[in-house]
């Protein structure tokens, strides 16, 4: 297969949803259809150790949440799909955010009983920055749900996207009978109890087919016909151009737990979602089909293999081809490196990559030299833009139970901060270590991982910090004066960038008024 064909069949997407909307379950079912897993792992029988395939750090298994972003690749419909699973839990917004910079489209999963929820709103704001195309799956139709029309209106008004239904539900909860596929003009009937296998489904052609009345009852059949007449009148038809511009989303209905409707959504995704896209670098725009290799690191994860203390840097290939043993230029350090052992992923199972193309995600073994946002090329000096770091909103001071382990603690914290699990600040005037996070759960994760991976027992104490800002100034003299007068509030972050640690928001506002030439930034590009 030619290089252009290889790139053209790639589809790289992430799933976004509010916690508990069913994202991990959908991931399972998607992989089941991609033949990657024979029996979906969400079915945790008594005493069975078959946990969901994409939730694989110990803590995730205990809490039933996906904390780290996994990457899974599988074939479907003549395409090769790269699925990036993102943490659904409240606290992992930074990791999730960065993952969204590495995809070409997104699948939005909505709990049809609840509609648009807070976390979905936040993540959608991120996708709007790059006008990422969105496919929508309305989940949990096998439970009692809200009026589907009402939920579509909510998506339109709250997320600013027009909705074009591709399928429409017939009943819900115990009365859920299946969906009518608008594009195919056929009804697909639902049978419960087939959640963990691909089932043979019965289809009925045409809306006016008397078989439909026999299958679902004439009252329900009649009300669906009336509903669909309204839907066809009120909702726009699917328009591919508007979809690619991020202005319209195709909507599918189903139940991930019952494994129903997921395949229709996958077909839509592979048919319509874009192949790898052109990306902006500071120097120029890079087209996916260029010959020369380029890629950027959007995430670093420590110790994917508990037996080896290694770290893996996840890289999105932007253009060209990766081949085993090729030389590439690590732009930030200026060094040429030869990469012979990159890996591809199937959540938790790693295999060595022989070749990979634009759109693929590969893992590089990282011995402390790679950071988030790093660019690798075949010699050209490029820096891909738009991979931000956020100022944390919560802070704790971290203390050791055994004071002799200060060195291991610092090493562990710096490594964890490089992979974006947490941010660490070292005040200039004392030996404290302050840890900053976007959500509370990150603190628990850090203590658990320090113990498991670095054999360091640490505890937290409260600290009077309201927020942190990265500071810089083009005028060297003014910067020196600012540093002299604010020594007590300055710290270095994990990457040795100067940071202003504000005890209160009032303090921050006063400091920025007193030093108008100094810039206080709430985000920093990696």
UniProtKB/Swiss-Prot annotation:
It holds the Pfam family GTP_EFTU. It is found in: Cytoplasm. GTP binds at residues 17-24, 85-89, 139-142. Residues 8-277 form the tr-type G domain. The keyword Ribonucleoprotein does not apply. Keywords: Cytoplasm, GTP-binding, Nucleotide-binding, Protein biosynthesis. CDD domains: RF3 (cd04169), RF3_II (cd03689), RF3_III (cd16259). GO terms for molecular function: GTP binding; GTPase activity; guanosine tetraphosphate binding; translation release factor activity, codon nonspecific; translation release factor activity, codon specific. One of its GO terms (biological process) is regulation of translational termination. NCBIfam families: prfC (TIGR00503), PRK00741.1 (NF001964), small_GTP (TIGR00231). Increases the formation of ribosomal termination complexes and stimulates activities of RF-1 and RF-2. It binds guanine nucleotides and has strong preference for UGA stop codons. It may interact directly with the ribosome. The stimulation of RF-1 and RF-2 is significantly reduced by GTP and GDP, but not by GMP. Belongs to the TRAFAC class translation factor GTPase superfamily. Classic translation factor GTPase family. PrfC subfamily. This is Peptide chain release factor 3. It comes from Aliivibrio fischeri (strain MJ11). The gene is prfC.
């Amino acid at each position: 297969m030619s290089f252009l064909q290889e790139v053209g069949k790639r589809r790289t997407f992430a799933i976004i949803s509010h916690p508990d909307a069913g994202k991990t379950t959908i991931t399972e079912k998607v992989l089941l259809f991609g033949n990657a897993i024979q029996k979906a792992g969400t079915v945790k029988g008594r005493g069975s150790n078959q946990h969901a395939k994409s939730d694989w750090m110990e803590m995730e298994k205990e809490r039933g949440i996906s904390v780290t972003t996994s990457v899974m690749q599988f074939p479907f419909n003549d395409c090769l799909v790269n699925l990036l699973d993102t943490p659904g839990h409240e606290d992992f917004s930074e990791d999730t955010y960065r993952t969204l910079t590495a995809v070409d489209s997104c699948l939005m999963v909505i709990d049809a009983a609840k509609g648009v929820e807070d976390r979905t709103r936040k993540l959608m704001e991120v996708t709007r920055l790059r006008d990422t195309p969105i496919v929508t799956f309305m989940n949990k139709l096998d439970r009692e749900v809200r009026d589907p029309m009402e939920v579509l209106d909510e998506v339109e008004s709250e997320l600013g996207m027009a909705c074009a239904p591709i399928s429409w539900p017939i009943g819900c909860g115990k009365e859920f009978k299946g969906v009518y596929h608008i594009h195919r003009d056929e009804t697909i009937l639902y049978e419960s109890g087939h959640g963990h296998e691909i089932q043979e489904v019965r289809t009925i052609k045409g809306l006016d087919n008397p078989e439909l009345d026999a299958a679902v009852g004439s009252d329900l059949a009649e009300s669906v016909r009336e509903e669909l007449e309204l839907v066809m009148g009120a909702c726009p038809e699917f328009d591919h151009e508007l979809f690619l511009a991020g202005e319209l989303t195709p909507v599918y209905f189903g139940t991930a737990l019952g494994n129903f409707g997921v395949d229709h959504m996958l077909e839509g995704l592979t048919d319509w979602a874009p192949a790898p896209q052109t990306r902006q670098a500071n120097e120029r725009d890079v087209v996916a089909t260029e010959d020369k290799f380029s890629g950027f690191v959007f995430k670093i994860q420590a110790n994917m293999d508990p037996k080896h203390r290694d770290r893996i840097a996840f890289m999105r290939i932007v253009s060209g081809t990766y081949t085993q043993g090729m030389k590439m230029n690590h732009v930030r350090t200026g060094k040429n490196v030869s990469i012979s052992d990159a890996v591809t992923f199937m959540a938790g199972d790693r295999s060595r990559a022989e070749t990979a193309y634009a759109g693929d995600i590969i893992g590089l073994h990282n011995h402390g030299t790679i950071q988030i946002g790093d660019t690798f090329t075949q010699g050209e000096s490029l820096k891909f833009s738009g991979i931000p770091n956020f100022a944390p909103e919560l802070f704790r001071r971290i203390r050791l139970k055994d004071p002799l382990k200060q060195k291991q603690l610092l090493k562990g914290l710096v490594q964890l901060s490089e992979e974006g699990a947490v941010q660490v600040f070292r005040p200039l005037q004392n030996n404290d270590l302050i840890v900053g996070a976007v959500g509370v759960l990150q603190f628990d994760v850090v203590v658990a991982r320090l113990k498991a991976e670095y054999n360091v027992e640490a505890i937290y104490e409260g600290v009077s910090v309201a927020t942190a800002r990265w500071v810089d100034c083009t005028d060297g003299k003014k910067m020196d004066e600012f540093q002299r007068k604010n020594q007590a509030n300055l710290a270095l972050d994990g990457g040795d960038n100067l940071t202003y640690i504000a005890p209160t928001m009032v303090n921050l506002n006063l400091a920025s008024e007193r030093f108008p030439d100094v810039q206080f930034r709430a985000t920093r590009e990696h």
